[in-house]
Amino acid sequence: MTTQDKDLTAQTASRVLSGIQPTADSYHLGNYLGAVKQWIDLQDSYDAFYFIPDLHAITVDQEPEELRNRTISGAAQLLALGIDPERSTLFVQSHVPAHAELSWVLTCLTGFGEASRMTQFKDKSSKRGADRTSAGLFTYPMLMAADILLYRPHLVPVGEDQRQHLELTRTLAERFNNRFGKAFEVPEGFIPQGASKIYDLQNPTAKMSKSGDNPKGIINLLDDPKVSTKRIKSAVTDNDGVIAYDPENKPGVSNLLVIQSALTGTSIDSLVDGYQGAGYGALKGDTADALEAFTTPLKAKYDEYMNDRGELERVLAIGAERATEVANETLADVYDKIGFLASRR
């Protein structure tokens, strides 16, 4: 390992990066408990970079004004949930041009067959059909690789559905480093401690998702409490009436226990013990109460941020400035190593 390589590793060993798309009016409970809650904890021990991937959002059709509104709303939600701009860097992807620039370099390093094997593209394109599938969806993994590699993070919180993309990112980093010299850290993916996988309320064997078949299966963080309570109380369970944690045989009941445990900090075992002899109505009612206790102050904080758009834009501008500084340093190194003529402007 060269001195330059050692310096690069030392600078980035404590850096973490992740993002969440602005493709809905509200983030849902699965977004928070499965990802953002852990991001908040990571701020204390890592140099954290969190971003809103609006470039990724346009791989499918978006209404311009809706995308703009969802992007600023997404930032307000992240801040209200606990992302602290004093402890992390929060920015919008399109505010840092280096993402698109590095994406092209990485696309040129990716084999067509390699990109064609990405299962998310195959799944989504088969559902949409060739005529409604953009080339941007095909190159999505290379943009994701650029998002990550620009900041030279050591760790990337990642869900199971993104593991293949992270493996491609690692492959591209190693390929570039071996061919041109080390410019990138090869990041490790990890699922943070305490991450909770939340399932659809109407189909508790499927992950809660904004693209789910039934909107009643999703708990949106900004929904009116009455709407969320109704969805919790109509959640699919089973017919035996026994409250037990058994994801395989009682997925609906287990999902409600996980939600309540994650929101209250009470262990699942303690919850199950407390419900001995009780029915599903008690479990659903308590889960709905825990959700309302969480979302009520959240929405108040969210409204404060949304009512001061100037402050929101200031926070994002500061984040973009820092992100650009880090990203441009990486991009300049890449451009030099790959043989681009340096610009003197």
Curated annotation (Swiss-Prot):
L-tryptophan binds at D147. HAMAP family: Trp_tRNA_synth_B (MF_00140_B). This is Tryptophan--tRNA ligase. It is found in: Cytoplasm. Catalyzes the attachment of tryptophan to tRNA(Trp). It catalyses: tRNA(Trp) + L-tryptophan + ATP = L-tryptophyl-tRNA(Trp) + AMP + diphosphate + H(+). A motif ('HIGH' region) lies at residues 22-31. It comes from the Bacteria. It holds the Pfam family tRNA-synt_1b. Keywords: Aminoacyl-tRNA synthetase, ATP-binding, Cytoplasm, Ligase, Nucleotide-binding, Protein biosynthesis. It is an enzyme of class 6 (ligase). Homodimer. NCBIfam families: trpS. ATP binds at Q21, P22, T23, G30, N31, G159, E160, D161, I198, K207, M208, S209, K210, S211. A motif ('KMSKS' region) lies at residues 207-211. Coiled coil: none annotated. Belongs to the class-I aminoacyl-tRNA synthetase family. One of its GO terms (biological process) is tryptophanyl-tRNA aminoacylation. The lineage of its organism: Bacteria, Bacillati, Actinomycetota, Actinomycetes, Mycobacteriales. One of its GO terms (cellular component) is cytosol. Transmembrane segments: none annotated. GO terms for molecular function: ATP binding; tryptophan-tRNA ligase activity.
